[in-house]
Amino acid sequence: MNQNPILIQRHHYRKTFAQKTPPEPLFLIHDGGGTVFSYFLLGSLGRNVYGISNPHFGTDLTWTNGIASMAECYAKLIKETCPFGDILLGGWSLGGLVAVQIAQILSGDSELNVTGIIMIDSTFPAEGQPIKTRRIAFNAEASTRPEMTEKTRKCMNEAQLQIRQWTPPVWRFPMAEVQDGQSHMAGLKMNDTTTPLSPPAILFRATDNSLDSNTDVSEASDTKVSNDGGSQALGFDRYENFDLREVVDTSGDHFSIFSNDNVNELSKKLKDACDKLTKKS
């Protein structure tokens, strides 16, 4: 994991009348196990694709402020790789939540613009809602060796705590100012709650929501979702001002969407989602 981000797919761009500039690169954040192994299984997405692994993987280091600290670090890594222009962010499971946090951090960047977010079967941990168990994904194939298993387990345990403690970022208009604890938005009605403030997002939902009873609980960590966690938006419909444009069903359950049987379908749908989010109006 010395190279971070790592280039997973290199797109050989040729200028055409319809495509005058290279496609926006996609940065995919690691799963709950801390690795980007699964993203190497994807078919061509028609753009440069980078994977960001957990740099604390295999160490005794932890993230002081959880997902917020992680996102700050990853935002810097992204800026070093792509200092200006348009980009896409995304990730599987935990990675989708971290991508949302990174997008909020980069929202104030004048040179780098997040044109969209792609969340792969990520669930929104709505505070104050009834909860049930759901699990944080990682790819077991990447951790078959004993030493890898232990490193992965540590990342999963930390991810479990991170999600439980995560406070999702608040999306505001750039002109919003906070004075005396109140938000004043120039040119906007104070009761205007209809305009989404985040980059547009597309959520991929595994169509088989059942958890395999034979799955060893040591291979997954729990996170909190509402009792309607199987609903189409996986809780993101309750995320205020979050611009969720579309929910795309994809074959498999939370753990098998990258399997040989399902990854081709996922790849095609991911490519379509990237194209939609970057389409110039």
Predicted regions and their residues:
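A hydrolase-biased, glycine/serine/histidine/acidic-enriched motif that marks catalytic-domain neighborhoods
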Residues: 1-281
